[in-house]
Swiss-Prot record:
InterPro entries: DNA-dir_RNA_pol_insert, DNA-dir_RNA_pol_RpoA/D/Rpb3, DNA-dir_RpoA, RBP11-like, RNAP_asu_C, RNApol_insert_sf
CDD domains reported for this sequence: RNAP_alpha_NTD
Protein name from the UniProt record: DNA-directed RNA polymerase subunit alpha
Compartmental location: Plastid, Chloroplast
Gene3D superfamilies assigned to the protein according to its UniProt record, in alphabetical order: 5' to 3' exonuclease, C-terminal subdomain, DNA-directed RNA polymerase, insert domain, RNA polymerase, RBP11-like subunit
Catalytic activity: RNA(n) + a ribonucleoside 5'-triphosphate = RNA(n+1) + diphosphate
Record flagged with keyword Transmembrane helix: no
Any one GO CC term of the record: DNA-directed RNA polymerase complex
Enzyme Commission number(s) of this protein: 2.7.7.6
Amino acid sequence: MVREKVRVSTRTLQWKCVESRADSKRLYYGRFILSPLMKGQADTIGIAMRRALLGEIEGTCITRAKFEKIPHEYSTIVGIQESVHEILMNLKEIVLRSNLYGTRNASICVKGPGCVTAQDIILPTSVEIVDNTQYIANLTEPINLCIGLQIERNRGYHIKTPKNFQDGSYPIDAVFMPVRNANHSIHSYGNGNEKQEILFLEIWTNGSLTPKEALHEASRNLIDLFIPFLHAEEENLHLENNQYKVTLPFFTFHDRLAKLRKTKKEIALKSIFIDQFELPPRTYNCLKRYNIHTLFDLLNKSQEDLMKMEYFRIEDVKQILDSLEIEKAFHNPFTEE
């Protein structure tokens, strides 16, 4: 464990790691400070950073497992102590580290008797296991166990929709969140107008990356979110009789989608749900009512299509562009191969 005495700077804004430790292979802890900040800035940064740490950082998980000749998820296999469901739950807990894009295949092929652990997983070269001792199953008889696995890198929490299991393939709910928890606290010092703040940020990770790495990645993601505002062209907005009435330059969501089709990224668009964006409740409910659930659905609509929806206004179109931070959606997740 590393611990340093906190020293407050009164000059240039700076951050420092004041505590760092590894409680286990799958639990890392780090505490950081940022100072000096003006009154109110610590809370602004702390809230944004916590949300970025918990929701914007990508992780790698096992998302599907395929067994041979298994009728359903709650089946038992002769010679294996656990049911198929219990094995799936154990696979869900496996912590992986990778730099892959998209999905990869992996497998388990072992012969009993004996315990099956994470070290028995045959992985692609771009993926590694954080803790080889993680338990999967116990083979009580000399049988062969072969499981095909699918590995994905993504972010957030994905609940898999059950489909046809006749091929023995079972989806696994995936938690693509390498940061287990993040907290922030504020210490104020000084008097009157000279009052300043220190931001304390605590980060716990699952071992697939360190708290310091998580802090760097979350910071980069936050910066990427705001870059479009720095380079945005001056909007062609003007007020008419009603000061809240907004006229937008001509555009269509469909035109922008055409460019994405050229890069064959529609699958990624379908995995981004409008729930992930902070749309006003009225706008959100209106989109859901017309079966617009994902970014792909939304980008497939023109401005005219949206305006035909009941109770939908031109101000709502503008709000969608602002809330979705559309430039990040086009230039960040879909430009990598």
